[in-house]
Amino acid sequence: RMLNQNEADLVYTLDSHIYDTNYINLQEGRIGVHFVCAANHPLADRPSVSLKELIQQPFLLTEKGMSYRRVMDEALAAKSLEIRPVFVSGNTDLIRNLVAQGAGISFLPDYTTKELIAAGKLKYLQVPEMKVEIWTQLLHHRDKWISEPMRIVIDYLHKCIL
């Protein structure tokens, strides 16, 4: 919407894939996202966990409507399921650290958890019933002229985060 109304020159998303012929997709990439728990959690070493069993666990989640949380909620709703979290925060670092301490389970992008996974403090839960795709995309409106400052920002984003 912001691109269509010329309220933004560029948009960098972390969400479900956006398909729109009005937008030029400058860069995109699929982002891994998993349910995670503490390494010593009873579900941690299971080869797979059912959704019905999983949603009975205490959950620490990002705020409702936030990109990957919204995508997860929609996927669960399609199965007539929902998670009622015991803790909600916009602070992903806080959530992942609480999960690592055994406070519950969360659903987070891999780039936020890979450090604690590598350190053996968190584990990914395998939930075969839940296939969710999260994408990063750098978009601009098809009719938008790319100014020199925009080109500099685009080049910076390509070097640093894309």
Which residues does each PLM region occupy?
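Short secondary-structure boundary segments
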Residues: 15-17, 39, 110-112, 128-129, ...
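Hydrophobic residues within well-ordered alpha-helices
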Residues: 2-4, 54, 97-103, 138
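Short beta-strand-centered segments that line the small-molecule binding cleft or hinge
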Residues: 1-33, 37, 100, 123-125
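A late-sequence structural motif
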Residues: 123-162
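A ligand-binding cleft/hinge motif common to bilobed small-molecule-binding domains
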Residues: 14-22, 70, 74, 78, ...
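Secondary-structure junction motif
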Residues: 44, 58-79, 146-150, 154
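Short helix-initiation/N-cap motifs at beta->coil->alpha
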Residues: 1, 88-95
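Flexible hinge/capping segments at coil-to-helix
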Residues: 23-59
